[in-house]
Amino acid sequence: MATTRKDLRGRTLRKGEMQRSSDKRYAYSYTDPLGRRKYIYANDLVTLREKEARFTKDQMDGLDIYVAGKATVNFVFDRYMSLKTNLRQTTRSNYLYMYDRFIRDTFGKKKIAEIRYSDVLQFYNYLLDKQGLQTNTLESVHTLLHPTFQLAVRDEIVRKNPTDGVMAEIKKSSEQTTGVRHALTIPQQRAFMEHIANHPVFCHWWPLFTVLLGTGCRIGEALGLRWDDLDYERRTISINHSLVYYPVGESRNSVLHISKPKTEAGVRTIPMFDTVKDAFEMLHEEQKESGWNDVEIDGMSGFIFCNRFGNVPNPQSVNRAIKRIIADYNAGEEVEAKKQHREAVLLPDFSAHHLRHTFCTRLCEKETNLKVIQSVMGHKDIQTTMDIYAEATEEKKQESFERLAATLDIF
C-alpha cells in the first residue's frame, strides 16, 4: 500500500507535491509533453496550490485553444512529440535541437490554422537565403513540420497540409550554386587528401579521412570503431554500433553515447582495403608508443580514434576540421593559381557525410551489382542505392560521350 507523503508540519501532500528538507521550499513536479520532468516552486503550501491551479487551468485552456483552431505551430509540434513515444533518445534530442534552432522562435509562433502553402514556401526560402541552410538541412526541418501539420489535419484543425509539395518546389526552382554536389570528383578527392597528408597541422587527420573515404562508413560508425571490430586476417571491418553526440537534460549539454544501428541493414561486415589497413596500422603504432585510448563510453572501450586530449572525437569536431582544411587549401590554391596565371581549382563546401557518398559513387563506378553496393553501404532501402548508382553512371556516360565527341569525326 502506498504511503501518504506529508510536509514537515505533518500536512498531507497531494500527488506530485513535495517539500525539500534543504530549504523547506515546496515543489510540484510534472512531466511536460516532451517527456521532461518540470517543477513549480513556492515558499508555502498555499501559494504552491494556487500555482498548481493556474497551471492546470492553463493546460485546459491550451486544449480549448487547440480545438478552436487557434493553437500555434509550437503547440501542435509539442503535442506531436508527446505522442511519439517510440522515438529513440538520440532521435528525439536531434528533433528538438533542430526545431528549437530553426523553427520555435520564428515560424513556430504562427497560428497553425492560418498558415498556407505560400507561407511555408516563403519560410523555407528564408532558411535557404538568409540563414544559409543547405537543402539537406532544410529537408530535416521539413521532416519535423510535415508530420506536425499532418497531425492537425487528422485532428480536423486544418483541412490540408500546407507543407505538401513544398520541398519538391524548392528543389525544382532553387538550383543550389553553393556547396558541393553529392560526391566529390576524383580530382577534388585527391586534392583534399594530398593537402592533408602534406600539411604539418592537418596531417593527423589523414587516417580518419582515409577510413571515411575507403569504407563509406557514416561518421558515427567510423568514430565508434574499436580495435576488436577489425579482422586483419580476413581483411574485414565489423560495423555493429555507432557513436552519437546529442544534448541531454535541462542544460542541453551534449555528451557521447553508443547507439545501435536503427535497422538490420546497418549491422554489416565491410572489406578493408590496403590504404585503410595502412591507416589503422599507423594509428595502432601511434597508440602503442603514446598509450592506448582508455576512454570508456557506455561500457565500450578500445576506440581506434582519439584527439589530442585523449578523447574520442565527436562528429561536429570532424566537420569543423573539414571546413578549416577546405579554407586553408583554397587560400593556398588561389595564390598558386595567380602565380601560374591559371584558374584556381577550389574545393567546394562539404561535410563528413559527403565522404560517405563519395565512396559510394566510386563503388558504383566500378561495381554493377546493386545488392553488393547496398550491403556494403548499409542502405535499408535499395532505392537509395539505385539513386546514387543512377547519378554515378549518368556522369560516367556523359564523360564517355564527351571523349567520343572529341575523337569521333562523322561529318
Predicted regions and their residues:
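C-terminal secondary-structure termini that scaffold catalytic or DNA-interacting sites
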Residues: 3, 234, 245-267, 274-276, ...
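N-terminal DNA-binding module of tyrosine recombinases/phage integrases
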Residues: 18-118, 285-300, 394
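C-terminal catalytic core of Y-nucleophile DNA break-rejoin enzymes
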Residues: 38, 44, 236-238, 247-248, ...
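N-terminal core-binding DNA-recognition domain of tyrosine site-specific recombinases/integrases
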Residues: 39-45, 69, 81-162, 200-203, ...
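Basic, Lys/Arg- and aromatic-enriched nucleic-acid-binding interface segment
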Residues: 135, 139-143, 154, 158, ...
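Short, basic (Lys/Arg/His-rich) helix/loop patches that form interaction surfaces
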Residues: 194-205, 270, 286-295, 300-312, ...
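Catalytic-site neighborhood detector that most strongly recognizes the C-terminal catalytic loop/helix
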Residues: 243-245, 358, 377-403
